[in-house]
Amino acid sequence: MKNVDDLIASAAELADRGLSKGEIADELNVSRETASWLVERSGAATEPEPRAEPEGPDDIHVDWNAIGSGGKRLTYVGRALADLLMETNGEADVTVGIEKAGVPLATSVSRELETTLGAYSPAKHQWDEGDLEDLGGGFSRNFSPVEGRDCFIVDDTVTSGTTLRETIDAIRSEGGEPLACVVIVDKQGVEEIDGVPVHSLINVVRVGEQ
């Protein structure tokens, strides 16, 4: 994806496939607000009358398809994420991947660290409109439980920190202990969430204003 028009077209395609705006946000690595804006723009493109273009959201799109589409590259990045965790944190029992993109990364990390593998589906995957707090996420029963275990959390990007915070809360609610989070890209410069350190391979820093 090279420009906003590509993102709008992708958002339209995903919406036509029945994905919620929260799932679209996850697929395109943008915030929920940006996903909503992209979907609205894709519908506006079919309007017969010209309309004033709405101001776009303040967000950064991260396309890591070159990593995700290659098994070896994904493994190498997973090793780098695992190395970040080993440098500054204790040993975990479970590596929890946040669905969807965080799970393949967590698989590589768990293999490198020799932990079991957990998977968490965040509330945003059900989100289309309204208050996210009215929705709930959950752990997959097909993966390792977190109760009574020390956990690492893995995702691809940090946009606002909402999903990481939700996952941290969910692990604690299940009786587990979140030790640290790790991502490929941090858009916000997040160092910790609710007392849990957040590590990233890449930090995106805005310089000046658009």
From Swiss-Prot:
Residues 39-60 are annotated as: Disordered. Keywords: Activator, DNA-binding, Transcription, Transcription regulation. InterPro entries: GcfR_halob, GfcR-like, PRibTrfase_dom, PRTase-like. One of its GO terms (molecular function) is DNA binding. Residues 48-60 have a biased composition (Basic and acidic residues). It comes from the Archaea. One of its GO terms (biological process) is pyrimidine nucleobase biosynthetic process. It holds the Pfam family Pribosyltran. CDD domains: PRTases_typeI. Disruption phenotype: Does not require uracil for growth, is partially resistant to 5-FOA (5-fluoroorotic acid). The deletion mutant loses its ability to grow on D-glucose, whereas growth on casamino acids is unaffected. The mutant also loses the ability to grow on D-fructose, D-galactose and the non-sugar substrate glycerol. Growth on the pentose sugar D-xylose is not affected. Interaction with effectors modulates GfcR activity. 2-keto-3-deoxy-6-phosphogluconate (KDPG), fructose-1,6-bisphosphate (FBP), 2-keto-3-deoxy-6-phosphogalactonate (KDPGal) and glycerol-3-phosphate (G3P), which are intermediates of sugar and glycerol degradation pathways, can act as inducer molecules. SUPFAM superfamilies: PRTase-like (SSF53271). Belongs to the purine/pyrimidine phosphoribosyltransferase family. GfcR subfamily. DNA-binding transcriptional regulator that functions as a regulator of central sugar catabolic pathways. Is both a local regulator of specific steps in the pathways for D-glucose and D-fructose degradation and a global regulator of hexose catabolism. In the presence of D-glucose, activates expression of the gene encoding the gluconate dehydratase (gad), which is involved in D-glucose catabolism via the semiphosphorylative Entner-Doudoroff (spED) pathway. Contains an N-terminal DNA-binding winged helix-turn-helix domain and a C-terminal regulatory domain (or effector binding domain) resembling phosphoribosyltransferase (PRT) domain. This is Transcriptional regulator GfcR. It comes from Haloferax volcanii (strain ATCC 29605 / DSM 3757 / JCM 8879 / NBRC 14742 / NCIMB 2012 / VKM B-1768 / DS2). The gene is gfcR.
